[in-house]
């Protein structure tokens, strides 16, 4: 749920210092089983991924709005614009570039998961060079995540029983998602009985 890892894991692609430095806001709709996490960076470095695909030079206003729909749908709405360009109160947000990322996370076993992903954009739609650039770099970023997640899986497996994880404010979205998943599992177990 938290994208601050972009700063450390995806430098040179989508990560910049501002991602980790900017606080998040988290909202939870317990009834709908949805978690919303937002990070709005008003003055951020433009990472190569966006500079090369949008043509923006200099600093940007960058928004990351995540929706997690339990149990398995993750949506990332990214807004990128020249620094200071905010969306209008009404009407289309024509001065910004928008990228939509969808992950459909499907567990296979206790230790393996299928992660189906897709990326859409509202700019340079007819530009094959931009399409190829985004496809190649999105794949690189996802594969960086796969490497990190495999290492994390090994770390979790090596933890002693009753290991107490330390959670901090940046984990509120992930903790809310875990809470909802636990509720859904318990409800399923009740139905199965």
Where in this protein do the model-derived segments appear?
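C-terminal catalytic domain of Rieske-type non-heme iron oxygenases
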Residues: 1-193
């Amino acid at each position: 749920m938290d994208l601050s890892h972009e700063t450390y894991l995806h430098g040179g692609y989508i990560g910049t210092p501002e991602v980790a430095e900017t606080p998040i806001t988290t909202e939870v709709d317990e009834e709908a089983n949805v978690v919303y996490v937002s990070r709005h960076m008003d003055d951020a470095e433009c990472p190569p991924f966006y500079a090369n695909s949008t043509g923006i030079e200099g600093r940007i206003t960058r928004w990351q709005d995540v929706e997690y729909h339990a149990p398995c749908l993750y949506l990332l709405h990214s807004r990128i614009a020249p620094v200071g360009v905010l969306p209008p109160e009404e009407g289309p947000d024509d001065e910004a570039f928008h990228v939509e990322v969808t992950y459909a996370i499907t567990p296979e076993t206790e230790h393996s998961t299928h992660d189906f992903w897709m990326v859409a954009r509202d700019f340079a739609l007819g530009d094959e060079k931009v399409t190829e650039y985004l496809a190649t770099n999105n794949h690189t970023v996802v594969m960086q995540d796969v490497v990190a997640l495999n290492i994390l899986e090994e770390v979790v497996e090596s933890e002693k029983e009753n290991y107490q994880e330390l959670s901090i404010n940046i984990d509120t979205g992930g903790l809310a998602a875990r809470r909802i998943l636990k509720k859904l599992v318990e409800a399923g177990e009740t139905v199965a009985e």
